Amino acid sequence: MDAERILLNALAGLWHDMGKFALRSGEGMREVWDEHAKHDVAYRHALASDSFVQEYAPERWRGRLAGVRYHHRPANLRSISDEAYSQACVVQVADWLSSGERDENAEGGPARLRSPFSRLRGHDAPFYLPLKPLSDCSEHLFPSPCVDEKGVPVEEYRELWSQFAAQARQTLSEGSLHRMDLRTFVETAYFLLQEYAWCVPSAYYNQVPDVSLFDHARATAAIAACLTADDREVPWLERLMRAIRSPRDDGNDAEALDTPVATLVGGDLTGLQRFLYSISSENAAKSLRGRSVYLQLLSELAAEFVVDGLGLPITNLLYAGGGNFYLLVQTTWEGDRVEKRLHAIQRQVVEMLAEAHGGDLGLALASTPITPREFFRGHFHEAWARLHQEIRRAKQTPLGALAPSRLAEVIGDGIGTGGETAVCPVCGRESEGGTEDRVCSICASLESLGMQVARANYMVLADIDIAPTAPQSARSWQSILSVFGRSVHFAKDAEDLAAIAEDLSARAKRLRVLCLAEGRGMSADGLNAFDFQLPTSVGYRPFARLVPWRDREESQIKTFDDLAEQAKGIERWGVLRMDVDNLGRLMREGFRKRDAHGISDSLTISRLASVSFALRVFFDKCVAWAALQADAASGVHGSGSCPDTGRSSRLYLQYAGGDDLFLVGAWDALPLTAAEIQAAFQEFVCHNPAVTISAGIALLPPKFPIYQAAHLALDALGAAKARTGGVFYLASSENGGKNAINFLGVSLDWDSFRTVHEQARKMAQWLEDGAVPRSLPQRILRLYHEWYEGRRRSVRQGRLRPRQRYFGPWVWHAAYQISRAASEIEDTEVKQEIRRWVSELPSDERNIMRLAMAARWAELCTRKRKDGNAERSGI
């Protein structure tokens, strides 16, 4: 395997369409576009892409990237250079397979990128992404409706290109090469495209422009790397190209279409929930965030470990998040099937996890070969479904990769020696070499990680020699992760960064430095000009963060009990869990469309990459922003929230990534935060009714165990998705349920939830002002229980069908009781509003459930503390 050739061909795949970006900005080319040039390279963008190579590729590699210029005309290189011709063939094939078709379309002017969510499940809404760098503030990255997708002022493209070109000159120039080898150069080129081409369409002529240049380019690079790693010979590539041009021919070339050219790989870390939440409540605020970041790093480094172990670049990591990852790798390894190598790598990872965590964590790894035919539209979903079937099978035996003798050791391992050995108060394991308060060294390091991440503006990943195994005596999360050949560090500022780089200079082989600060990007604090002494790649990484600091010096984070004390009304903290509904089905079936010719499926690897990356943008960037808006709007205890810094007053984001989130906060802040996140999500997915999100909220007293809180919130989320525990058993719902929130034990669709919130807000304000008797909420709740018991009794006795409307004494009791309460009210507007609520009760019996929930909510928000503190009312 030629490692340099793999990287060069991946780079050629990454840059093959750079000319499209340049031309849309009005950028000139080094050569004149005429008939000779057209005959030579076929399309203007190919010539412009070559101009980009000539300007930004270092001289030592520039001459080995001819495939960029000739990816539409490989034959023009046949008699010039075998290596160049092979590369051009590889890039052309990879380009076709990435787009899911033989793409030979004409060119046009500037166009906008359509959000991939605007077309899922038959939705057809013209929403387009702004031409903004990925590191820009979250509120600037939402799609918006546009009448004319091609009506983009050249100035917008020119501004984006200007920023991109400036970064390219700083990070890819000859002057920076003292800190770059080919691998770090490819990584930096990758991060540059991610930063600036995530919002640029790949193609648009005769096509819907819903795949970004970044996603198409990275998929092309991944396929090119696979073809090169498998050492595909030119004659075979020529046969495949002929077969792709004429896929219906039954000649000898057709066989190439059904020969696997790559392998889809899926990984799933198992045991995450138990590892995250099986900790004491006392230390939860310190430990939970560190544990979630550790698992995030573990998932990503495990994915990169597989990619590195197969000699592939970062482009072949299609997605990593939420404990899952997806890769595209070659079909062979050292003359054998790649599955054998994958199994060996999996065994290494599972061995390490068993050593470090005693079998609590495992890795399910599965793969399936994919043929050229399956890359094409109408077929890719078959390979994707096949992979997930294999993943489900692999998850049944997450430790199955262990040797039988080692598996017996892990399963039969005792829980400790007993006796006088100290037990860690966080994880409950026997503690050796821990802190004075008996916290074991690993838990102490995870607490430290949570604090580091809360302050960090940079993340540094250093390539180091791979540790042979993670010893059971590992003292920190860093020592565990070192078995992946990575040393991970977080830095607050340039001074910290310099100290980390100095410390790593003697033991690391190369560095990757990622800026985590929103709105600053790759150029923050002169990052590009920093002399790291080692080969270094640089980039920007979206990173969700929301921290309730106790002080402006950021020395301590509020505990969960602190958050409960800050709550309005009753002293409670809470957990909010949210995740996307039916995501697996959306990915499998979202691009299917029925027309006069039947059912078509436009899913391709590039579209899959686009949807996955878009979800990452929302959860890694927009969730924290939306939550901060809700926190800042609450106006509680001064101006503690700061959207620019991730400083929150009453919310602590423990995890956001993949397709879900876990957030802790003062109980009363959580429902409004959930509503704000849901509204932001709907805007982000172009108000597509098929792409929804659900939420579950659990309210807890101080000192309540976090593992129980997590399960209660998960149960609430499950109830929301099933639409149980509330109004939904009375009526069927669209979308198979889901698209709902469960709060105070009641499941509501989001519109009903907002109606309830408005009623609760008014009621709480009236109670605070003394405009209504304090007995009003209890009167409403008694009516609700009368309705509930009467309905249940009638159903049990067979006098009422489950979905039939129930009328009974509760109706006139409601009219009497609440009207009597209203008669005691002096404010005319308040009196009229309450009477309106009563008049609406018989028209839809779900109204009594909504009103009861509002009454309960208002009562909790205005309840006095036992210590005699003043009420903290309002919603």
Please place each PLM-identified region on the residue numbering:
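Charged, helix-rich terminal subdomains or tails
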Residues: M1-G323, L328-I875
